[in-house]
From Swiss-Prot:
Species of origin: Bifidobacterium longum (strain NCC 2705)
Chain's role: Catalyzes the reduction of the glycolytic intermediate dihydroxyacetone phosphate (DHAP) to sn-glycerol 3-phosphate (G3P), the key precursor for phospholipid synthesis.
Catalytic activity: sn-glycerol 3-phosphate + NAD(+) = dihydroxyacetone phosphate + NADH + H(+); sn-glycerol 3-phosphate + NADP(+) = dihydroxyacetone phosphate + NADPH + H(+)
Organism placement in taxonomy: Bacteria, Bacillati, Actinomycetota, Actinomycetes, Bifidobacteriales
Protein's gene: gpsA
Location relative to the cell: Cytoplasm
Binding positions (NADPH): W13, K33, K108, S142, R257, V281, E283
Entry annotated with the keyword Glycoprotein: no
Identification of the protein by name: Glycerol-3-phosphate dehydrogenase [NAD(P)+]
UniProt-listed Enzyme Commission number(s): 1.1.1.94
GO cellular component terms given for this protein: cytosol
Pfam families xref list: NAD_Gly3P_dh_C (PF07479), NAD_Gly3P_dh_N (PF01210)
C-alpha cells in the first residue's frame, strides 16, 4: 500500500524524486515557498520553473506552501533543500512532523561554519533520533531520472528496517534503491564528490582531455575516501554506487551543475560570472572550503579541495590548480 510522502523543496531533484515516489504508488505532496511553483504543480501538474522538461507530473502529486498542511499526515518526509539553507528552513518544521515519520535527506553538502554533514544538520534541526533519519545518494542526475531513464541509488539509515521502508517507497521499474547502514559514508560521498566534479569540469573547460580528468577523479576519490574513513565511514561505500558511481555521473555530464560550473571557470569566467549563468545551486562551491576545514579538523590532507578553494577564493587558473595538486617529491600512490 502506498504511503503519504512529503517532499520539502520543489527544485529539479526534489520534483524529479517526487515523480519517482508517485510512480511507486505513493501520494506525494510537494512543499515550496514559491507560489508560482505551488500553483503550477497543484493546478497544472507541471513545474515550469525548476523542471520544465516534464510536461505532466503524475496525478498523485500535489503541492502546498503551508508547512503544517504539507507534513501533517506524512509517513515519510523528504528534504530537498539547498544544503547551506537546510538548518534555517528545517527549524520551521520542528514540532510539525509526525512522531512516526522517517525523514529522508536528498541533500549533498557540508555546512559552512560548522563542518557538519547533512545528517547532523537535519537531526539537530528537528531533534530527530538516528533511527528515523535516512539519506539517499547515488548517480542520480535529476533530468535523466525525470525522463525515467534506468538508475539506481543507495538509502542509508542506522535502522536497516527503516532504510528498507524508504527503499520500497521509491522502487519503480526504472529506479532501483539499495540499502546500507553506513550513513556517514553515504553523506561523505555525496558531499565531497562535488568538489572533484568542479575540478574535472574546470579541466575540461580549459581544454584538457581524458588523462587529466582521470587523474583528478582518482585522486579525488582517494581524498574523499581518506576523509570518510577518518570520520568513521566504511571504505567499501566509496567504491559503490554512492561513491564511484556518483563520481562517474557527476564528473562526466553537462547535466551536473558542479561539472558545468567548473567548466565555465575553466573557460575563463570568474566565480561571479559562472554563478550568474548557473541554472540552480552548484553545491560544490560552498562545500569546498568546508571540506578543507574538515580535513584540518580530521588531520587528513585535502590537496584537491585546497587547490579548488584557491580557485574560488583567489582566482588562480586551472593550470595553477593542477600544478599545486602534487609536491615535487616521489611518493607512493
Amino acid at each position: 500500500m502506498g504511503k503519504n510522502i512529503t517532499v520539502l523543496g520543489a527544485g529539479a531533484w526534489g520534483t524529479a524524486f517526487g515523480q519517482v515516489l508517485a510512480d511507486a504508488g505513493n501520494t506525494v505532496t510537494m512543499w515550496a515557498k514559491e507560489q508560482q511553483i505551488v500553483e503550477g504543480i497543484r493546478d497544472h501538474h507541471h513545474n515550469a520553473v525548476r523542471l520544465p522538461s516534464v510536461e505532466k507530473l503524475p496525478d498523485n502529486m500535489t503541492a502546498t506552501g503551508d508547512r503544517a498542511e504539507a507534513v501533517k499526515n506524512a509517513d515519510i518526509v523528504v528534504v530537498a533543500i539547498a544544503a547551506q539553507f537546510a538548518r534555517v528552513a528545517l527549524v520551521e518544521f520542528k514540532g510539525l512532523i509526525p512522531d512516526h515519520a522517517i525523514v529522508v535527506s536528498l541533500m549533498k553538502g557540508i555546512e559552512r561554519g560548522t563542518n557538519k554533514r547533512m545528517d547532523e544538520v537535519v537531526r539537530e534541526s528537528l531533534d530527530l533520533p538516528a533511527d528515523r533519519f535516512a539519506a539517499i545518494s547515488g548517480p542520480n542526475l535529476s533530468k535523466e531520472i525525470a525522463d525515467r531513464h534506468p538508475a539506481a541509488t543507495v538509502v542509508a539509515c542506522t535502522n536497516l528496517d527503516n532504510a528498507t521502508k524508504v527503499a520500497e517507497a521509491c522502487t519503480t521499474s526504472y529506479f532501483k534503491p539499495f540499502v546500507t547502514t553506513d550513513v556517514i559514508g553515504l553523506e561523505m560521498c555525496g558531499s565531497l564528490k562535488n568538489v572533484t566534479a568542479l575540478a574535472v569540469g574546470m579541466a575540461r573547460g580549459a581544454g584538457y582531455g581524458e588523462n587529466t580528468a582521470a587523474m583528478i577523479e582518482t585522486r579525488g576519490l582517494a581524498e574523499l575516501t581518506a576523509l570518510g574513513v577518518a570520520a568513521g565511514a566504511d571504505p567499501k561505500t566509496f567504491f559503490g554506487l554512492a561513491g564511484v558511481g556518483d563520481l562517474i555521473a557527476t564528473c562526466g555530464s553537462s547535466l551536473s551543475r558542479n561539472y558545468t560550473f567548473g567548466a565555465n571557470l575553466g573557460k575563463g569566467l570568474t566565480v561571479e560570472e559562472a554563478t550568474k549563468v548557473s541554472n540552480g545551486v552548484a553545491e560544490g562551491v560552498p562545500t569546498t572550503d568546508a571540506v578543507v576545514a574538515l580535513g584540518d579538523q580530521l588531520d587528513v590532507p585535502t590537496p584537491l579541495a585546497y587547490q579548488m578553494s584557491r580557485v574560488l577564493n583567489e582566482g588562480i587558473s586551472c593550470s595553477e590548480m593542477l600544478a599545486g595538486l602534487f609536491g615535487h617529491e616521489v611518493t607512493g600512490e
